[in-house]
Amino acid sequence: MLIGSRANFMFLVHNESVGSSFTSPRPFRVNAGAVHCYTLSPDGNTKYLSELETGSEVLILNSKGKARRAAIGRCKIEKRPMLLIKAKVGNEIGGIIAQDAETIRFVKSNGKLVSVTHLKKGDSVLAFSKEASGRHFGMEVADEYILEK
């Protein structure tokens, strides 16, 4: 899923299809991050993670950009340790607050996965970025400009 703290800058967050010493693979699950983060809907609008619920449709992407719709089967909010991760694409800077856990992975530009617990300054991960514009209730407003920090 594309997830980020800004509507115009989102990180490709991988599902939990890779097991760890703590858990079995759970390919149906995406640990998306803090509830204030945005995700991209199949219709091109954004939604806050806090707005998602069972039955909500979200956009699922692979590392090559191929997208499909998926319906949420279960949505849960938990209190967990979190990390702030920032990145830059051109002149745009974006961030995400993600759970501090080895099972949370981003996708590198070569298609390989990297856990947020192993990210290092200078690592390159896949992200969606475009010039900032205004949004109102998730819909892009073409004649507005908003600077988010």
Please give the residue ranges for each predicted region.
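Active-site loop ensemble at the mouth of alpha/beta enzyme cores that anchors a bound cofactor
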Residues: 1-31, 83, 87
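Short, basic/aromatic beta-hairpin or loop at an interaction surface
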Residues: 27-40, 92-109, 147
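Short, surface-exposed secondary-structure boundary micro-motifs
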Residues: 44, 57, 63-64, 124, ...
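Short, well-ordered loop/turn sites that connect or cap secondary structure elements
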Residues: 49-53, 119
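Extended hydrophobic-aromatic, low-complexity segments
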Residues: 50-51, 60-61, 67-72, 82-84, ...
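Glycine- and charge-enriched low-complexity intrinsically disordered segments
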Residues: 84-136
